[in-house]
Each structure stands twice: as C-alpha cells, then as structure tokens.
UniProtKB/Swiss-Prot annotation:
GO terms for molecular function: ATP binding; proton-transporting ATP synthase activity, rotational mechanism. NCBIfam families: ATPsyn_F1gamma, PRK05621.1-1. One of its GO terms (cellular component) is plasma membrane. Produces ATP from ADP in the presence of a proton gradient across the membrane. The gamma chain is believed to be important in regulating ATPase activity and the flow of protons through the CF(0) complex. F-type ATPases have 2 components, CF(1) - the catalytic core - and CF(0) - the membrane proton channel. CF(1) has five subunits: alpha(3), beta(3), gamma(1), delta(1), epsilon(1). CF(0) has three main subunits: a, b and c. This is ATP synthase gamma chain. It comes from Hamiltonella defensa subsp. Acyrthosiphon pisum (strain 5AT). Gene3D superfamilies: 3.40.1380.10, ATP synthase, gamma subunit, helix hairpin domain (1.10.287.80). It is found in: Cell membrane. Its main location: membrane. The gene is atpG. InterPro entries: ATP_synth_F1_ATPase_gsu (IPR035968), ATP_synth_F1_gsu (IPR000131), ATP_synth_F1_gsu_CS (IPR023632). It is a peripheral membrane protein. The keyword Membrane applies. GO terms for biological process: proton motive force-driven plasma membrane ATP synthesis.
Length: 289
C-alpha cells in the first residue's frame, strides 16, 4: 500500500502543476482579448477595400483582372494557418482533418494540391505525411505583423500569377466564442463576385472618378485585399488558439482539484488506518503486560 509520505508528495506535485495551469489560463484569457481587439480593428480595412474592388468590378470595365476570372481548375493552393504551440485541445487536429478531406475531394476530381504553411504545427504535420509544401514560416508572435507572414502569401500569389495555381484557399480556425472554434476553408482566388446590395450601390449611382487608372488601382487593391484577408485569418486563428488554450487549462486546473480531493481522501484513510494500527498495537502490548 502507498505510504502517507508518498501521497503527500503527490498532492504537492499536483498543486504545483495546478498553479502553472491556472497561470496559463489567465495569460491565455488576456492574450485572447488582445487578439480580438486586433481582429475588430483590422476588419473595417478589409471590408472597405472589398467594397472599392466591387465598385470597380461593377463598372463594366474593359480590363478584367486575372484575380476576378474563373479558370479551369487543375491545381489548387492552400494557405494553412496553424499554431506554433500546443496545449490548445483539438484545434490543430480538427483543422488538419478538414484540409485533408478537402484535398481528397480535389484529388477525386484529378486536381492537384500544394500548401503554404504558417505555424510550426502545420509544418510538422504536413511534412510528416509528405504533402507538397512550397513555403512555410514559423515563430509567429501573438501580435503578428504583415511582414511576419508575407513570405507564404507571396509564394502563392506568384504561383497564381504564373498560372501554376487555379484556385487559392485559406484554411484557419474561425473564432465563434470562447467555448467554440470552427475550422474553415475560405476561397481567396479567384475573388468571389459581390452583388450590388453587398456593395451598397446600384449601377445607376456611379459617379466616381478613380485616380490612378482602374487597372493600376485593381492591381494594387486586389493584392492588398488578399494580404489583409490572410492577416485577418492569422489574427482570428490566434484568438481561437488562446480561447482553446484557456478552456484546456481551466479543465486541467479543475481536474487537478479533483485529483487533489481524491488523494486527500486516500491520505486520510491511510492516516486513519495507521492510527488504528498503532492503537491496536498499544492495546495489545498493554494486555500482554
């Protein structure tokens, strides 16, 4: 039977771990709030660019940008946003499963796939299964900047510009609330058309003069829009990561408390048995005298 000393040692060890998980829970909660603020701050920028692109696209321009035109799909690209650290439940696993399912569906249509990865967990996983990886970046901070993630984005845009990709998707975790994060795959290119209602104008209301010329403007805005969408996806994935970690650490802290209660009960029983044994020995010794 385990001794009282060993039980006390286990209780102390669990309490020490519990302090760590509680601290990690609080840190994750703080980081989640900050990343949500970043997410809210960057969303209007992307929405406004999208509306301007929609205005230009509805203008019946002779120039049709390649990013707005459908192609026959032979190869697709995925910009995969994963985490650099673990301890966030099934966040990465669920995302990878969704990507593999989508890649399998593409393969059934004789469409090849290639990946550009943001986050060390994605790099480790897709390297382990031998997927085609064209670019990768790891070590993204909790407050990312566009230069931190631009490498994989530029690699995919270059492939699309050169005709080596016919569709481009971003795969990341969507932040729904603290308790719920959902893996999602969103089409980036070609850009899905917006109707007049989404833009907020009708063709009759056109009275805009653009400078520089629409072609130059589209070239710049479309690339900026894709970059902003990827950045938004990275920030949202960080929010999802911190929320999942906060929930996981809270569960670990609660489980630690339950384990301490169980160990304390075992310790009390062992202590009681020890006292009973000592009393029995004392009574037995007295009777012998």
């Amino acid at each position: 039977m385990i001794s009282a000393k060993e039980i006390r040692s286990k209780i102390a060890s669990v309490k020490s771990t519990q302090k760590i998980t509680k601290a990690m829970e609080m840190v994750a909660a703080s980081k989640m709030r900050k990343s949500q603020e970043s997410m809210s701050a960057t969303r209007p920028y992307a929405e406004m660019i999208r509306k301007v692109i929609g205005h230009l696209a509805l203008g019946n321009l002779e120039y049709k940008h390649p990013y707005l035109q459908e192609r026959k799909v032979k190869r697709v690209g995925y910009l995969v946003v994963s985490t650099d650290r673990g301890l966030c439940g099934g966040l990465n696993v669920n995302l990878f499963k969704k990507i593999l399912t989508d890649m399998h569906d593409q393969s059934e249509k004789n469409v090849a796939s290639e990946l550009s990865l943001i986050g060390s967990k994605g790099v480790a996983f897709f390297n382990s299964i031998g997927a085609k990886i064209v670019a990768q970046v790891t070590g993204i901070s909790d407050k990312p900047s566009l230069p931190d993630i631009i490498g994989p984005v530029q690699a995919m845009l270059k492939a699309y510009d050169e005709g080596r990709l016919d569709k481009l998707y971003i795969a990341n975790n969507r932040f729904i609330n603290t308790m719920s994060q959902q893996p999602q795959i969103t089409q980036l290119l070609p850009l899905l058309p917006m109707d007049e209602g989404q833009i907020g104008v009708t063709k009759k209301s056109w009275d805009y003069l653009y400078e520089p010329e629409p072609k130059v403007l589209l070239d710049t805005l479309l690339r900026r829009y894709i970059e902003s969408q990827v950045y938004q996806g990275v920030v949202e994935n960080i929010s999802s990561e911190q929320a999942a970690r906060m929930v996981a650490m809270k569960a670990a802290t609660d489980n630690g408390g339950n384990l301490i209660d169980e160990l304390q009960l075992i310790y009390n029983k062992a202590r009681q048995a020890s006292i009973t044994q000592e009393l029995t020995e004392i009574v037995g010794g007295a009777s012998a005298l």
